[in-house]
Amino acid sequence: YFLFTHEYYEPATSERMADFTADKVFQKRVLTIILAKSTVILTGLSLDHALKACCVISCIALLYGFRGLLRETNPNPAAGSEFLIIVPLAWNYIALNGIYHSYDLPSLAFFCWGIVLFLRRRYAWFYLLYAIASLNRESTCFITIALFALLLRAPTKSIHVFPLREVVKYNRLLILHCTGQTVLWFIMKNSVEYVFRGNPGNYYEKTFSMYKFLGDAWAGKASWPYLTPETFLGNPRCFITLFAGIWIFVPLFWQFVPEQTKKLLWVAPPYLFGAILFANLMETRVYHEMNIIITACAVGGIHEWWRARHKKTC
């Protein structure tokens, strides 16, 4: 990861982040740089080494968090399947783009652990993590959406009637929690933006045209961030290999994907809507939490298919 990724944009470098002079859109994701600067002061390490230490710890936390997520959403998770998250992450973050931001990997660990802690009813730890994670990246809102999708209970008296009053009655505690999380998210987000209101730039990036990118990909022409179309990884057509292609296993093994795991896919529509508005969709590192969701569905589907096949042959 450290050898094959790079900081491509000068207003977002680690040095600028550490000086709190980076553009707003990057500086508001301040957690890792604060931790790194504190590590530098306490240990004498360089900023680069401190950031790498944060990244290593985040990777370990991600593996344990993803294992916990699989256990909470899948009744029969395969042993060691948490390591498969490395496949789409290595492909999206290293092979396809190689653009480094210190807050990318921590956001995935926070997403997994946020869901796990809430499902285990460790609410005090959950809200502490939620507040801290909001300093790392504003995508903590997708933890709330995932929890709502996983825990929502629907009235089952009639498949033709879905009365709102009964939905509220059945899910009063969940709605209170999600409302509280939403309020906390807005408080943390607006507080950070207020602190760095004097930084240059805007709070959201000006995005490149995805339509133009797809047109260039169809024609095989160079298009940012794929600028050497004569090579495989430099050709925009390789974008189709997003998530290392494991997304294809989700529809292929859909009937075997555990029902609880399927619910995580409800995060996809609001996630993609936000990405369309505020992110460069051709930049594969922006599909952060979707790596977790796609991999969980693929792993669950393949494992349950294998178990069903094994039962038939026994």
What are these regions, as identified by a protein language model?
Residues 23, 145, 153-157, 162-256:
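Membrane-lumen/periplasm interface segments of specific transmembrane helices
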Residues 105-125, 153-154, 294-297:
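Specific aromatic-rich, kink-prone transmembrane helix
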Residues 21-45:
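Short hydrophobic/aromatic helix or loop-helix immediately within or flanking a transmembrane segment
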Residues 257-276:
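Transmembrane alpha-helix segments characteristic
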Residues 30, 48, 55, 62, ...:
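Aromatic- and kink-enriched transmembrane "portal" helix at the membrane-lumen/periplasm boundary
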Residues 112-117, 124-150:
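Membrane-interface alpha helices of multi-pass inner-membrane proteins
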Residues 282-303:
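Hydrophobic/aromatic-rich transmembrane helices and adjacent perimembrane loops
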Residues 53-74:
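Transmembrane-helix motifs of polytopic, lipid-linked glycan transferases
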